[in-house]
């Protein structure tokens, strides 16, 4: 698989700036010759706005519903996302799990729906700080793997330690590797990316971890300059 760099814009930005950001980012990536796939996951309203702005950038979404259609006010199906040009969809992000009480089983249903619609789900899992401090890291990760992952189809695993999301704190390389080893004991084939406080300063250390296929970037993806620095940094490490 190509080096995968995913931007999760969460609920930031506005309709006027989405396309200009995408065009500027695309122009900055013209000279990147490495085998890298850049994915933008904007708010739903921007999906149709940016899909044609940059042929060298893939479009993703931040969530989907597990039914393909029906009387589900306010929901967006994976089939709809595919029809507007999405290639990926994030499911199971901790903010969805904690704020909207999405269970592992709900995440699995969403992932299955995404696969059936022709999308590649990016399934987020990760431990809390309490899990790690109480010696429950392995149980926490394996429970999420078993209950969140579909049994068939292609998907990407996003390892995001809950305590690193939205912070300036990133786990040590040894801590990340320990978690990846646990995940790999359950799934030896799917690509794994890392998310949680990824920025220009730590990208080279993170992407140098052999088991990783890329990164999921939050706040540092909201500015073209910082996001490009992350992409360039990751590419440079993988090319050397």
From Swiss-Prot:
Catalytic residues?
93 (electrophile), 160 (proton acceptor)
Annotated GO biological process: gluconeogenesis; glyceraldehyde-3-phosphate biosynthetic process; glycerol catabolic process; glycolytic process
Q: Which residues bind substrate?
A: 8-10, 166
Location of this chain's protein in the cell: Cytoplasm
| A Gene Ontology molecular function term of the record | triose-phosphate isomerase activity
Q: What is its EC number?
A: 5.3.1.1
Q: Which GO terms describe its cellular component?
A: cytosol
Pathway involvement of the protein, from the record:
Carbohydrate biosynthesis; gluconeogenesis; Carbohydrate degradation; glycolysis; D-glyceraldehyde 3-phosphate from glycerone phosphate: step 1/1
Electron transport among the record's keywords? no
Chemical reaction(s) catalysed: D-glyceraldehyde 3-phosphate = dihydroxyacetone phosphate
- What keywords does the record list, in alphabetical order? Cytoplasm, Gluconeogenesis, Glycolysis, Isomerase
Spell out where the chain crosses the membrane. Answer: none
Top EC class for this record: isomerase
SUPFAM superfamilies (alphabetical): Triosephosphate isomerase (TIM)
Q: Which PANTHER family match?
A: TRIOSEPHOSPHATE ISOMERASE
Complex formation:
Homodimer.
The protein's job, in short, is: Involved in the gluconeogenesis. Catalyzes stereospecifically the conversion of dihydroxyacetone phosphate (DHAP) to D-glyceraldehyde-3-phosphate (G3P).
Family according to the record: Belongs to the triosephosphate isomerase family.
Designated name of the protein: Triosephosphate isomerase
Organism (species) = Ehrlichia chaffeensis (strain ATCC CRL-10679 / Arkansas)
